[in-house]
Design a protein with these regions (language model features):
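Alpha-helical substrate-recognition element adjacent to the catalytic core
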Residues: 2-148, 153-156
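Alpha-helix N-cap/helix-start and coil->helix boundary motif
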Residues: 9, 152-153, 177-180, 203
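Short helix-capping segments at alpha-helix termini
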Residues: 21, 163-166, 190-191
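Short active-site oxyanion
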Residues: 140-146, 168-170, 194-197
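A short, structured active-site edge motif that brings together acidic residues
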Residues: 165-178
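Conserved Lys-Pro-Asp/Glu-containing loop-to-beta segment of HAD-superfamily phosphomonoesterases
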Residues: 180-206
């Protein structure tokens, strides 16, 4: 689905600026967010890792320092991403209930609002031309699954809305773990290694393969 632009520009980024109070550097926050998530090698990265990377890059921009902007401490979120492989809202919600950390709570509120906005705004988006026909052909010779770092709820909604969910055996989102873990769960040990094919549009897809 050609949804990355609308999701990142209209749902993720505005909430990134709002929740982390980046209004006085909004121009640079937007540039950095879009670079991180759309126009660089980290395109398609998990949303929480994207927050960490965006703040890392913002910390290197002189425009940010010139405006006296103090960036938030990402230590707590970074620690969680290093210890948890299922980087989704359910795991973060459980972690938040255990640690009583304001920065973790903020990341969770931001992520939940992003999901709300996506559900409200992103609909009626058809798959790329030729996808249905390709899936029909693929199903004649292969078992197909969805491998993504998008929440499962959004993935299932998009695939069902367009009537193509029946072409895949599993719809795996961020709640199932990393893309590498998705592939391992679904294919490794079940199919010869030279019969497993990962198709994607981001460096993270290549890395997972």
């Amino acid at each position: 689905f050609d949804t990355m632009e609308i999701k990142q520009k209209e749902c993720f980024c505005p909430n990134f600026i709002k929740f982390y109070e980046l209004q006085k550097i909004s121009k640079y926050a937007r540039e950095t967010w879009e670079f991180t998530n759309l126009y660089s090698k980290t395109r398609g990265v998990n949303r929480f890792l994207a927050v960490l990377e965006a703040f890392r890059l913002l910390g290197q921009r002189p425009e940010v320092h010139d405006r006296g902007m103090k960036l938030p401490d990402m230590t707590s979120l970074k620690k969680w991403t290093q210890e948890e492989s299922k980087l989704g809202n359910p795991a973060l919600k459980e972690y938040a209930s255990q640690v009583n950390d304001a920065d973790i709570d903020l990341a969770l509120r931001w992520s939940l609002k992003v999901n709300e906005d996506i559900k409200e705004l992103v609909y009626g988006m058809p798959p790329f031309p030729g996808v249905r026909e390709s899936l029909e052909k693929l199903n004649e010779q292969a078992d197909a699954i969805v491998v993504s770092q998008t929440p499962v709820e959004a993935l299932e909604r998009e695939w069902k809305e367009n009537g193509i969910d029946s072409f895949v055996r599993v719809i795996a989102g961020q709640e199932y773990g990393t893309k590498t873990e998705h592939l391992a769960m679904a294919a490794v040990g079940k199919y010869p290694s030279d019969r497993i094919l990962m198709i994607g549009d981001a460096p993270g897809d290549l890395k997972a393969a």
